[in-house]
Structures are given as structure tokens and as C-alpha cells.
Amino acid sequence: MVRYVKFSRTANRGVHISAEARINERIRVPEVRLVGPNGEQVGIVRIEDARKLAFDADLDLVEVAPNAKPPVCKIMDYGKFKYEAAQKARESRKNQQQTVVKEQKLRPKIDDHDYETKKNNVIRFLEKGSKVKVTIMFRGREQARPELGYRLLERLANDVVDFGIVETRAKQDGRNMTMVLGPVRKGKK
């Protein structure tokens, strides 16, 4: 079996970049710009002296800016730092809104009552904060009359203008015509 491996000319260029910050003995430079445990600037010191200061304070020496010349290191409690970073990441994920896209399918020759039902579904989705993808499905001879689909989507957009705005205008995609509606963002009170 032959296995092909793709190499990229721009990837890494021989530099290994770790997702984790280097700490204590893993820092392999002769001197660093040191920041104290309270945020005060200590200055440029030899790495041995920086490690000794961190050891005396019963803290870790953490490389916070490895690309600087010389690299910037800070004396801190690395376990606490990692815990707080994980808490912030978890909090930011929790505050992110999941965008849900609902789909409502219609036919170009839809009856009035059916249209009202579909329109009410679209309004309900928009009120809940979901985006709605409205799809008009053409079949047979209906494909020769795309203007029916445009008119129907325009009518729907006008009917739900108080609840949603058109994010993607109507466009033909094979046998279907689609339009995306997004909920109206209410201003913060």
C-alpha cells in the first residue's frame, strides 16, 4: 500500500509551536524580560536568575510572549492561570448564541390557507430567534415560470417584515428557489 503525504512549504518552517506555554525548565533562552508576580517590570535578566526568583516565590516562570526579543516571562501560579483561562473559555462558549436555521418549503401554486399556515410557521420561527430558509420547490412546467417563485417570496418577505429581514435575496438553485430570513434584532433596553 502506498501512502501519500502532503507537505506544505509554509507550514512551521522547522519551528515547533506548542499550544501550551513553556514554563520553568522548558524555557531554553539565555535571557528574558521578566515581569514580577504583581505585574511590575523587573527588566532583562538571565534565565537562571528568573527561575531562582520564581522558585523563591514558590511560583512558576511562564513564557507569555515567546516571539518577543528577548522573550517575555512572568512569575505566576501556572495552575491557577490555566484554571482561569479555562473558566473564561467556558464562559465565552456559554454566552455564544447557537444560530438555528429552520426550513419552510412551499410550492409556487400554493393555496391561500396553506400560505397563511406556512407564513405563521415562519413568523413563529423568527419570533424564537431562528433564521428561516424559505424554499420554493418547482416541478415540471413550473420551472419555466420562475417569476411565480420570486413573487411568492417577495409577498412572504413583505408579510413578515415586522418579524424578520431578508438576509439572502431569492435565488434560483436548480429546481428550487431559496431565500433566507433573519429575525429582527430588538435594541437593548
Swiss-Prot record:
InterPro entries per the UniProt record, alphabetical: T_IF-3_C_sf, T_IF-3_N_sf, Translation_initiation_fac3_CS, Translation_initiation_fac_3, Translation_initiation_fac_3_C, Translation_initiation_fac_3_N
Subcellular location as annotated: Cytoplasm
One Pfam family linked to the record: IF3_C
Keywords annotated in UniProt: Cytoplasm, Initiation factor, Protein biosynthesis
Gene Ontology molecular function, alphabetical: ribosome binding; translation initiation factor activity
GO cellular component, one term: membrane
GO term, biological process aspect, one: ribosome disassembly
Subunit structure: Monomer.
Family the entry assigns: Belongs to the IF-3 family.
Function comment: IF-3 binds to the 30S ribosomal subunit and shifts the equilibrium between 70S ribosomes and their 50S and 30S subunits in favor of the free subunits, thus enhancing the availability of 30S subunits on which protein synthesis initiation begins.
PANTHER family registered for this protein in UniProt: TRANSLATION INITIATION FACTOR IF-3 (PTHR10938), TRANSLATION INITIATION FACTOR IF-3, MITOCHONDRIAL (PTHR10938:SF0)
Name of this protein: Translation initiation factor IF-3
Gene field: infC
